[in-house]
Amino acid sequence: KKLKDQHGIEFLSIGGGLGIMYEDALASGDVKWWNRKAAKDILTPAKYAATLVPRLKPLGLKILIEPGRFISGNAGILVTRVEHVKNTGKKYFAIVDAAMNDLIRPAFYESYHEIIPVKQSKARAVKTDVVGPICETGDTFCKDRPIPRVAEGDHLALLSAGAYGFVMAGTYN
């Protein structure tokens, strides 16, 4: 009350803080997934509000929250075509037509994006490096990730690309 009355403050922005599901991104879109025991400790908007509202309500201020990533993160995907498959005997690579200029987050932050075949596959999963065509060592979407074996012409979906994926894209190389 003191903040509002003595200082003329009307709003309190608590910022963001709500993350998204990177692993199980696709499965977490199903309500049944959230009923699992493993999901009980995940911070949801309801749990966030239940924790903060009782503490902030006495201030008498309008509370602002910035849930952008929570809303848009899993709303976008990057679909890419496998251009070439390379097996060195020690490493298995899927070289795709998307590159770090299309989704820079893995190169910048080593961020995790679930990668799945667009067409469901019963192929055996193999540890795969999914890499782009740019001549940079950072043009890598994942390393040693178990992904069903792919072939040239297959399409992969990189999930959780909705927040910042497009706005951070560039025209490099």
Give the location of each predicted region:
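Active-site loop/helix belt of alpha/beta enzymes
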Residues: K1-R81
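Charged (often Lys/Glu-rich) extended helix/loop segments that serve as interaction or gating elements
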Residues: T51, G60-N173
